[in-house]
Regions:
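Noncatalytic partner-interaction/assembly domains of nucleic-acid and motor enzyme complexes
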Residues: 1-107
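Non-catalytic interaction/clamp surfaces of large macromolecular machines
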Residues: 113-128
């Protein structure tokens, strides 16, 4: 059976992740639109997931979703370079469409991970 190579670039889009996060910073209402679509684990870049998680925490605590509060929520996870990249990214209008795309890429990554685990699981010895 031939092994097919998977183009990992189709499984994430860092620009799209940054655009979603930038849109939330510019308008916290965008977070309400995608709150039920995305989780922090859907972001390919762990730092983006951490920022998203901090945004959700701010929303849940009725705090403004802005850099000062995000920095406090992130604590030692705060990365100024990552935050500057997010802030420097243009916001998007249809944040829900982009969130669905990120979710789809996350699901595909999970499927690839499972597919890679199957051969080793199949070849494991079962206890008698």
């Amino acid at each position: 059976m031939a092994k097919e190579n998977i183009d990992m670039h189709n499984l994430y889009d860092l620009d799209m992740e940054r655009a979603i996060l930038a849109s939330i910073i510019y308008s916290a209402d965008n977070l309400s639109e995608i709150f039920d679509i995305l989780s922090p684990f859907d972001f390919y870049l762990r730092a983006h997931g951490d920022v998203y998680d901090a945004m959700v925490k701010c929303l849940n605590e009725n705090l403004p979703v802005e850099t000062g509060f995000l920095k406090t929520k992130l604590g030692s996870k705060f990365d100024e370079n990552v935050m500057n990249e997010i802030i420097g990214t243009n916001s998007i209008l249809d944040v829900k469409k982009y969130a669905n795309e990120i979710k789809e890429k996350s699901i595909k990554r999970s499927l690839v991970k499972i597919a890679h685990q199957i051969p080793s699981k199949v070849s494991e010895d079962k206890p008698s």
